[in-house]
């Protein structure tokens, strides 16, 4: 009897480096190491009390059975209502919405339904690790496209034009961006939308961090594009309401694509957890309480960001100033012939010698950098940043 051999479906699949980094930190802490985990990509705040209370009421009322694959109608209706308030074109309706088990599933549904063998899809790089793997699982080819550092690594139509070929079928956008925290302006998004429309590309807009911005708004593509004909917008409650474990996201897309994605989901997870859908409905149905909870969280993130940036700049550490999300993207060193992934080496040494867990930039296809999350208690963030500075200075020497 032979052992397990992976199928050809997953032979090239790489596990999520962000999840792996956090799991490693948790394992070391469980073994007694005083590890500071700055690798996690989730808010360190509790789910708002009003959401918890409504979830409890829904549970008592029997919200424990299957729902439609697309999700409960009241939740889809309020998502559509909120999207329509943003959209500059036609009204968004509930039959354009699918509620998913987190935004990750919504993105996978879209990639798997839109792209296939021979298709190329451009991914802003550095970019979230799962974009590349989802496209590969869909048999499409992810094309890493890099922007200039002076633009916070954001892309322009010129960048896209240089990377595109006759096989290009789409583009993934993420603003605010994971891992850099960069936010695209309205003008920047308008230029990209026009460029993509001229070429009949699909745009997948990942807007999960949109509510977490510090220096002005993070525009939704819904407020830029006049039509949703070749647009998929993905969002959820995980980051803006500290509801990562509830696993609720959604997609907004053309009806024909939505039907295809619903068929796909009917054979994978079916509906997202019923209780979680009711919790998400509570979060979206109480705008005043929701705005207060999100504003309080964002205010604390901003204070942490500012304090950490002050320390890093005083030490002359190269860092991209985040305008949104909750990550610091820090230069670990320059790649050389001997050291091709300085970010990976630095992250390993940081954990082994200084008990600080971060995510190496190789996870985001930029091996000279590391991602540091400040979605952790303030004292942990500040002590972790001090250790990063200490390690960086000693490594350079």
Each predicted region: which residue ranges?
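PLP-dependent class I/II
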Residues: 1-6, 11-16, 21, 26-35, ...
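A glycine-/small-polar-enriched, mobile loop at the entrance of the PLP active site in fold-type I
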Residues: 39-42, 57-76, 85-86
């Amino acid at each position: 009897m032979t052992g397990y051999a992976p199928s050809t479906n997953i032979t090239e699949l790489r596990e999520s480096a962000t999840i792996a980094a956090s799991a490693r930190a948790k394992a070391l802490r469980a073994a007694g190491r005083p590890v500071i985990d700055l690798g996690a990509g989730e808010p360190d705040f509790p789910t708002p009390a009003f959401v918890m209370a409504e979830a409890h009421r829904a549970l008592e009322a029997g919200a424990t059975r299957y729902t439609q694959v697309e999700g409960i109608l009241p939740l889809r209706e309020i998502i559509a209502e909120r999207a329509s308030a943003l959209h500059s074109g036609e009204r968004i309706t509930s039959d354009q919405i699918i509620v998913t088990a987190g935004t990750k599933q919504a993105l996978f549904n879209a990639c798997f339904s839109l792209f296939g063998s021979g298709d190329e899809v451009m991914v802003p790089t550095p970019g979230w690790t799962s974009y590349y793997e989802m496209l590969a699982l869909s048999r499409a080819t992810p094309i890493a496209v890099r922007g200039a550092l002076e633009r916070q690594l954001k892309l322009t139509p010129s960048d896209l034009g240089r990377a595109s070929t006759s096989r290009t079928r789409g583009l993934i956008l993420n603003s605010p961006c994971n891992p850099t925290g960069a936010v695209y302006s309205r003008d920047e998004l308008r230029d990209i939308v026009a460029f993509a429309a001229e070429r009949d590309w699909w745009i997948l807009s990942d807007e999960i961090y949109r509510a977490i911005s510090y220096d002005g708004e993070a525009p939704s593509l819904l407020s830029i594009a006049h039509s949703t004909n070749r647009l998929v917008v993905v969002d959820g409650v995980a980051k803006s309401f500290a509801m990562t474990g509830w696993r609720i996201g959604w997609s907004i897309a053309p009806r024909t694509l939505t039907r295809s994605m619903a068929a796909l989901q009917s054979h994978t997870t079916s509906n997202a957890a019923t209780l979680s859908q009711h919790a998400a409905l509570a979060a979206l149905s109480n705008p005043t309480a929701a705005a207060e909870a999100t504003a309080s969280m964002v205010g604390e993130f901003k204070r942490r960001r500012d304090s950490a940036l002050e320390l890093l700049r005083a030490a002359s550490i190269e860092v991209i100033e985040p305008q949104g999300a909750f990550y610091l993207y820090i230069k670990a060193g320059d790649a050389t012939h001997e050291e091709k992934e300085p970010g990976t080496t630095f992250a390993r040494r940081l954990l082994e010698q200084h008990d600080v867990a971060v995510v190496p930039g190789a996870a985001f296809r930029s091996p000279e950098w590391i991602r540091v999350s400040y979605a952790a208690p303030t004292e942990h963030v500040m002590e972790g940043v001090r250790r990063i500075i200490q390690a960086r200075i000693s490594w350079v020497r």
